[in-house]
Each structure stands twice: as structure tokens, then as C-alpha cells.
Amino acid sequence: MMRENRIRRAMEIPRTLKLADGTAVAYRVSSAEARRPGRVLVLLHGLASNLTRWSEFVEHSSLTARWDLIRVDLRGHGGSPARGLLTLEAWADDIAAILDREGHAHAVLVGHSLGAQVALAFAGRYPDRAAGLVLIDPLFRGALGGRSAWIARLAPLFRAAAGIARAGNALGFGRKTLPALDLRELDREARKALASAASTEAFIRHYSSPRADLRYFHTAHYLQEMAEMFRRTPPLERIRAPVLLLLSRGGTFADPVLTQRVAAQFNDAEIVMIDAEHWPLTERPVEVRRAVAEWCARRKLR
């Protein structure tokens, strides 16, 4: 199995797409053994994250035999440095450009947290190109609670603060370089520690800590993303693509019961509950891979 994983990593090809505005978006492509245009999963990470969040998924997924897998460093993240405003619309347009380059008219988008919001924005902006959506702990405005609801209400202040930070960057203030963040290794260490209630609380504090995120992420981008993450989604009843929702029972940022009620607005949705807090790719990676593969097979998205 270890040898097989090394082979899969070797077969994954890193690519960069230079966009019209000068931004270079980095992504990696794992081509299926039986490749077919349109049979592709685009994997989208969360806030202040990067494509290494999906390393284990790509290495171990049973989908690699029949599906292309594309994991993206959203602009402003990881290997896709960017200046200026980060928006859901810009990320959606970047994904469309990547699909064009790779020869796919449509795709199944798999997004975690902020990545789920990007997937929804893509489906709203490019309805004919969204063949399906897998939303891992999406953040619907009607289901937010606690700190998340507070952040959503203060979104205009976060946007204003982000603008001030960008102005400072333009004047030469701010960090020029950031250390690399390998989430695959971070996730491995986290799983070793997740053995008690106390360690679970420590895990939540660390994985939701702005201080920890800002070690690896620009302040202006972080403030802007805090506003983007809690924007209202496109009308869910207008999304024609089938949807799979993977919801954490812990409900760290959103109430899972309220999330299910909001999700009832989709025309065609299935829900799978997972014993996790908000990071099932870290906490329950095997369950996530199984749920996605079974859904793709059951819905005949192949």
C-alpha cells in the first residue's frame, strides 16, 4: 500500500495557470486510468488553508481509477500568491479557467468550509458546469451560531479592515514571505493526539485559532476571507446539480440540525452525518473518502 501511495504521488502533476490579471494559480492533477472529459472532481480547501489538506484524500481515494482529481491552491493561498481582493466570484472564475485548460466542460466540486462556499458560488455562477457538489460542513447564514454568527454580523468591519491592510501592503508594510504549511503532516499529528475530551478541546482551539492561521497567511487575505466565508449563498432551490452534504455532529461553527433544515431547500440532496467537530478530512478521513466514492457511484456520476 505504501508503494502504491508513492506511485500515486509521483503520477500527480503540479501545474500553474497564469490568468489575465497576472495571478498564477497553482493546482495538481491526478489523471484517471480510464480518463473521460467531464469526469473530474475539483477539491477545494478551507479558510487560510491550501491544497495539502487533500493530500491523503488523493493518495487513498478509490476514485482515482475512473476520475481525474484536481486540487487547487485558491488564489491567495499556498502556491497561488495574489494581490488585491479575494472574492467567491474570483475563486469561481479561477476554477472555470482551470477546467477550460484541462478540457473539462463540467466537474463535481468537493469543498470543505470556505471551499464549500466556493463550490456553491461556482454552481450559482456556472450552473451548466456543476455536475455535482459535495459540501463538507458548509456555513449557511441560517444555521450559524456563537462566534460564527457574530463574525457574519461584523462582515462589513472585516472588509474595511482588510482594505486598510491591503493599503498598508501597497505601501510596503507587511510580510513579504510566509513559511510553508503542510497540512498533511499537521493532520497526522492531530489524529495521534485526539484520544480524549481534553485533547479534542485543544484540537478545536488550535484548528480554529486566528493566531495559528496568521503564522502562514497574510492578514489582509485573512480578514477578507472572514467576510467572504459568511456571505449569503446563491438561492439553494436554483441549484440543479445533485448535492452531498457531509456534516459534522460537533457543530463547531454551525448547528447541524439547522444546517439540515436549510439544506432541505436543495432540489436533490443527500446528507451524511460524521462524528467530527468541523474538520472531518482530519478527524475522519476514511469516512469522508468512503462517503464521496459511494455517492459518486450511486448517483452514476461517472
Task: For each feature predicted by the language model, list its residue ranges.
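Conserved HGGG/HGGXW glycine-rich cap/lid loop of the alpha/beta-hydrolase fold
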Residues: 23, 28-81
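Active-site loop/oxyanion-hole signature of alpha/beta-hydrolase fold enzymes
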Residues: 23, 28, 65-110, 114
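Catalytic histidine-centered segment of alpha/beta-hydrolase-like enzymes
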Residues: 276-289
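Conserved serine/cysteine hydrolase catalytic core
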Residues: 208-264
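Short glycine-enriched nucleophile-adjacent loop
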Residues: 116-127, 133
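Catalytic histidine neighborhood in serine/cysteine hydrolases
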Residues: 265-278
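Flexible "cap/lid" loop of the alpha/beta hydrolase fold
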Residues: 124, 133-173
